[in-house]
Regions:
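An internal, short helix-loop-strand segment that often contains or flanks glycine-aspartate motifs
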Residues: 56-95, 128-244, 315-319, 379-480, ...
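Flexible loop/turn segments at secondary-structure boundaries
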Residues: 296-299, 355-356, 410-413
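Structural boundary/hinge residues at secondary-structure and domain interfaces
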Residues: 20-132, 138-146, 189-239, 243-343, ...
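Short, surface-exposed ligand-recognition loops at beta-strand->loop->(often short) alpha-helix junctions
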Residues: 112-116, 350-356
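Short, hydrophobic/aromatic-enriched beta-strand segments in well-ordered soluble domains
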Residues: 112, 164, 251-256, 400, ...
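Beta-propeller and related beta-repeat scaffolds in trafficking/envelope systems
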Residues: 358-385
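Active-site acidic/histidine clusters and adjacent loop/turn architecture
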Residues: 106, 349-350
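Sec-dependent bacterial lipoprotein signal peptides
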Residues: 1-18
């Protein structure tokens, strides 16, 4: 069964190598309420992956052996013809392949253009002989079949694959045929955001909103949201481009809800462009660095409008005056995590005064009741060490800088700058053009730790990436625009070509 499903997946992947006519009627089949729609420039991506040259032939040879494994006679010959000449599949995708998801990830779909209905029918019949697909049935002006856990339908212009996230594929039949019957103006392509996906120049372009999140995860997300704000209102346009030595993802807000717009316009005043004061206060081998610039008092008041957050601010684990701490912060903030231990960190923030430290002095009578389980010691005129259940914390104010750290040496060296610092990184100049900036130093992920998160699949990915990547950076110029960039050690090879070379091994 697994082998059959693998062949279905590989065949669908092969279909993405096909060419297509300039007609776009097939886009009518995208559901209007889709929570995620992704348009892929398959032809460009195949070229960037280096699958058109001699190296590509080696990959296709390996692919032939994998796909043909277990196939006999005509089925084996057809599989080889499709790999050699993708148009033999009956599908054509030089323009775009579309992937989509329905609200709350209840179903996923792949949409493509049919160039030759007869050839596609032959392909489906071959899958039927291999017991991968059910016999073709004709209904509502199209033919459809059940293949594994998915349903497929096609006519003389459109190929649609639909797969539910749970349950039997046959339950999606009504939805499948309904989408195949959609006309101009009835589907997602009638919405203005679809035109952004259609603009050329991106390898992948997508529009997505928060209704894509599964039902079980929406309740905590909606806590504190106004009743007139729907998850569908929070939507973004996201692009991905595969370049030499890196992949770059950009995001742009498509939010139109007046309440949300007003909130984020206010946040633009509270979270301001970073000055970059603390770049030289962290060593160059810091594992994670993040920075921003905030007006703490205004940020506290904004956060307090959310009932859930306000409850946490009003009832912290220790009875300290959280508002006074926030209100003292005015300017750059930064935090760095050590490459050998995620529990070892150093936080800095510009502050206007140290008056808020009195709130910790007021804790002493309460801490005395813990029988020594939590202690607070003075280690300087405005410096403290708190020993808690979770470890030791050093904090205080020096030269109008609040610091918090879990390391004694870092506490003793507060204010120290380094010659080989974060400020020497190639991306350091970008920090000052953003309001938020974070960097993961991939090369410094502990090489001796095979278990990083405890999740085997995530750990495998991390261990795989750390040997090939330099850094992963995420930034925001304002609330409307964000960027993520994963950079390889190999600066000359396109990211997709590098990925294919890994798969070959």
């Amino acid at each position: 069964m697994i082998k059959k499903l693998l062949r279905v997946t590989l065949v669908i992947g092969l279909l993405l190598l096909a060419s297509c006519t300039p007609e776009t009627e097939y886009t009518h089949a995208i559901p209007k309420n889709a929570s995620v729609v992704i348009g892929m420039e398959v032809d460009d991506m195949v070229h960037k992956a280096g699958l058109n040259g001699q190296e590509g032939e080696k990959v296709l040879t390996q692919l032939k052996a994998l796909v043909k494994g277990g196939l006999q006679g005509e089925a084996s010959q057809l599989a080889e013809r499709i790999i050699d000449q993708p148009s033999e599949s009956g599908l054509s995708f030089n323009d775009k392949v579309y992937l989509f998801a329905t609200p709350h990830a209840e179903a996923f779909g792949i949409l493509a253009k049919v160039s030759d209905e007869g050839k596609l029918e032959t392909l489906i019949e071959m899958l039927e002989k291999e017991s991968i697909a059910s016999p073709l049935r004709e209904e509502s002006g199209c033919q459809w079949t059940e293949a594994g856990t998915a349903l497929c339908a096609f006519n003389n212009g459109t190929f649609l694959l639909l797969q539910p996230s749970r349950g039997n594929a046959s339950t999606m039949k009504g939805t499948l045929l309904s989408l195949m019957r959609q006309k101009e103006g009835e589907g997602f392509c009638a919405l203005p955001e679809f035109q952004k996906i259609e603009v050329e120049g991106n390898d992948m372009a997508s529009v997505m909103n928060l209704s894509a999140i599964p039902h079980e995860m929406t309740t905590p997300l909606r806590m504190g949201l106004s009743a007139d704000i729907r998850l569908e209102d929070i939507k973004y346009f996201i692009t991905a481009n595969f370049e030499s030595g890196k992949v770059v993802v950009n995001s742009e807000s498509l939010i139109q809800n007046p309440r949300i717009l007003s909130f984020f316009d206010t946040m633009d005043q509270v979270i301001q462009p970073i000055q970059g004061k603390y770049l030289d206060y962290y060593q160059g081998n810091t594992l994670i660095w993040a920075g921003g610039k905030i007006t703490g008092k205004e940020l506290y008041h904004i956060l307090s409008f959310n009932p859930t957050i306000k409850q946490k601010l009003d009832n912290p684990p220790l009875p300290v005056d959280v508002e006074s701490i926030f209100s003292s912060i005015q300017g750059d903030i930064a935090i760095g995590f050590d490459r050998k231990s995620s529990k070892k960190f150093l936080f800095y923030a510009d502050v206007t005064n140290s008056d808020f430290l009195k709130t910790f002095e007021d804790l002493r009578p309460l801490l005395a009741l813990t029988g020594g389980q939590i202690t607070l010691d003075n280690v300087g005129s405005h410096d403290y060490m708190m020993d808690t259940y979770y470890g030791k914390y050093w904090f205080g104010v020096k030269n109008n800088r609040l610091y918090v750290t879990t390391d004694r040496t870092w506490a003793e060296e507060v204010g120290r700058t380094y010659g080989v610092s974060i400020g020497r990184k190639p991306w350091a100049s970008e920090v000052k053009t953003n309001r938020l900036y974070a960097s993961l130093n991939m090369a410094e992920i502990p090489k001796y730790r095979t278990k990083v998160t405890g999740d085997s699949s995530i750990d495998y990915a991390i261990n795989f990436l750390r040997g090939s990547c330099v850094f992963l950076n995420v930034s925001m110029t304002d609330w409307r625009h964000g960027k993520a960039e994963l950079v390889l050690k190999d600066k000359d090879t396109n990211f997709l070509e590098w990925l294919v070379s890994i798969l070959k091994k």
